[in-house]
Amino acid sequence: GVLPFVVELLRRGTEVVLVANALPALNDVTADELSSLLERAAETCGGILKSALYGDEGQGLKTPSLYVVSSGNGGPCIDLRRASRELIEASLNVDLVVLEGMGRAVHTNYNAEFVCDSLKLAMIKNARLAERLCQGEMFDCVVRFDAVSTRDDETLTSSAEKP
C-alpha cells in the first residue's frame, strides 16, 4: 500500500492528508476504516507514524501532521467535482496531490490539471486500457508526474490581479 510512501513523506517533515471514500467500493478502504488502520499501525510501529498521527513534542511535532479525510465519493473512481467540504478545505494551499489506483489516477483524472504538482500512480488491470494508454500490457504500472510550471503560476497571478 501507500503507507511506506506516507512514512517517507513524514520523515521529511511533510504534512500528509490521506483521502479515502466515504462509502465502501470494491476492495477500497473507507475513511473510517483508514483511520482505524492508521491507529493500529501507529500503535504497532510507533516512531514517526505515531508522532505524526497524535503529535509528539519530543519529536518536534506539537500538532499532528497526518490526517484522514473523506472524499465524499463512494465509488472506485473519484469525481473531484463532488468532493466533500472536508476534502476541499484540506486541499487548500497543498504543494502536491497524489492520486493512487487505476480508478482515481487513470480512469477519472489522468488528464486532470491541478494548481499544484500532481503524481498519478496506478497498476493497469485492463488489457485494452493498457494498450490504449501506454501501448503496454496488463499489470504494467503508470507513474505520471505533472509539474505546475512557473510560467503558469505567473499567468494565474497576473490574471487574478487584473481588474
Language-model-detected regions and their locations in the chain:
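Short beta-alpha junction loops
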Residues: 20-26
